[in-house]
UniProtKB/Swiss-Prot annotation:
SUPFAM superfamilies: Trm112p-like (SSF158997). Gene3D superfamilies: 2.20.25.10. It holds the Pfam family Trm112p. One of its GO terms (cellular component) is cytosol. InterPro entries: Trm112-like (IPR005651). This is UPF0434 protein PSPTO_3844. HAMAP family: UPF0434. PANTHER family: PROTEIN PREY, MITOCHONDRIAL, ZGC:162634. Belongs to the UPF0434 family.
C-alpha cells in the first residue's frame, strides 16, 4: 500500500489517524478500536468489514 495514501486516509468512524499493521494486511484505528483489511493493496474502509481490536492490540503502542 502506498504510504502517501496512508497520510491522507482517516478512520471513517472516529476521523482519527490510521497505522499500517506490521504485516501490511490491515489499517489500524486505535481511536475506533478497529482494524480495516487491506486487500490487493486496497484498503476496505467499511465498518462492516473491520474487525474489533483485542484489548492487547488497543494497549500496544
Amino acid at each position: 500500500m502506498d504510504t502517501k495514501l496512508l497520510d491522507i486516509l482517516a478512520c471513517p468512524i472516529c476521523k482519527g489517524p490510521l497505522k499500517l499493521s506490521a504485516d501490511k494486511t490491515e489499517l489500524i484505528s486505535k481511536g475506533a478500536g478497529l482494524a480495516y483489511p487491506v486487500r490487493d493493496g486496497i484498503p476496505v474502509m467499511l465498518e462492516s468489514e473491520a474487525r474489533t481490536l483485542t484489548t492487547d492490540e488497543r494497549l500496544d503502542k
